[in-house]
Amino acid sequence: MQLNGRGIFVQLYTKTGDKGYTSLIGGEKVRKDANRVDAYGTMDELNSLIGYIVSQLEERDSSLKGELIEIQQNLFDCGTDLATPHGKGTYKVTKEMVQNLEMSIDGYADKAPEILSFVLPGGHPTASLLHMARTVVRRAERSIVSLSFEETVNQYVAVYMNRLSDYFFAVARAVNNRYNVKEILYERGGKVFHPELKKEDLN
């Protein structure tokens, strides 16, 4: 138990999930290992990792801190949408949120040297954590895709998560560049990035 703002004890546990079921928004009960629960559970894991990254940022990274906190807010929106069966509520994640993320990606892409091959995850401690976040995003995205083949979900949640992994990749590279940490390139692969292609060529 803990005290709320009025000095009243609030019980944190409900015991309603002791038999392996949980309730979605709207009241439907599903197993805790259902794809829907796995999807928004991974979203929670990602949000916690981002919170840790925020706590480790240096003063010079204050603008990044603000961005990451906004992403944490957006991830709660994503989790809410994933916990809402189709027709049981209004979705929160929008096309505009995806577009805002794309603008951030473009901005960070200009803050690191051009590369043609993959880079090994690592470098500055903050960049390493951002790469970790990128891989958790990918796992969350896989869960969402699995769910989308079973049930109707907000399409923009999947799109947002796809862009978010690109965001963390771009930011990790920008952080390494800012702190003058040289990236290690993957030496056994071919050209995977094509700078000659313009953004409009991909649309």
Regions found by a protein language model. Name each.
Residues 2-203:
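Phosphate/pyrophosphate-binding loop motifs in nucleotide- or prenyl diphosphate-using proteins
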